[in-house]
């Protein structure tokens, strides 16, 4: 019989948590934010990080945090239950439209072409926000430093037939995505794509691709970070249904249209099986 003092400790028991000083909220103008940070970072391996993500944490490089704001609960951690996800008509069209993209999964690594696309994306989508001036070192610290099981995925067009004399010439780079592989799912870290291609919905395609990958790996969830009703930048996440949100430590199906963000009956959220037209 195991003595109570010999019971296995929680994976989080060796960590310490502290709250940051207040800082301007990057999502809601005029708001003040705080974060709760998990330390020390060298103890946060893939198993520990899986538990932290289940508790609503995210990471930026080796910095692991979750919202810890005074009097505000606008940030809702969300995830897609893979086997219950049903793509809508628009998502099926996006999947078919970009089905020819070639996805290559690799360890995190620096590539000058990736960095150039990142800077174009930031300049077009987030001009004046600071990230459009990121140096190569800042880019690496943000996206290429990880102590857990992380991958870089690049999406390219098929090689141009005009380069028949150069069989190793890759197709045009359209998108790069960083993902973490957890014990119970994939976690979408960050994605940037070609901003000069209008109305492409690359971001939507990326999430659909991650859902398919999770399904093939028999992982039940795709974690999408935080959803904020008042933030237009976050609106796309509500299109992936059913969507689960973390409420008081429990994951429940979320109704984005509910005035009080009340969870809904899970039996009403979506149907089983992923039905994406591959044609």
UniProtKB/Swiss-Prot annotation:
Subcellular location: Cytoplasm
GO MF annotations, alphabetized: arginyl-tRNA--protein transferase activity; leucyl-tRNA--protein transferase activity
UniProt catalytic activity: N-terminal L-glutamyl-[protein] + L-leucyl-tRNA(Leu) = N-terminal L-leucyl-L-glutamyl-[protein] + tRNA(Leu) + H(+); N-terminal L-aspartyl-[protein] + L-leucyl-tRNA(Leu) = N-terminal L-leucyl-L-aspartyl-[protein] + tRNA(Leu) + H(+)
Cysteine disulfide links: none
EC number: 2.3.2.29
Cellular component, GO annotation: cytoplasm
Pfam family of the protein (one): ATE_C
GO biological process: ubiquitin-dependent protein catabolic process via the N-end rule pathway
Catalytic EC class: transferase
Function field: Functions in the N-end rule pathway of protein degradation where it conjugates Leu from its aminoacyl-tRNA to the N-termini of proteins containing an N-terminal aspartate or glutamate.
Family recorded in the similarity comment: Belongs to the R-transferase family. Bpt subfamily.
Protein name per the record: Aspartate/glutamate leucyltransferase
Species of provenance: Paraburkholderia phymatum (strain DSM 17167 / CIP 108236 / LMG 21445 / STM815)
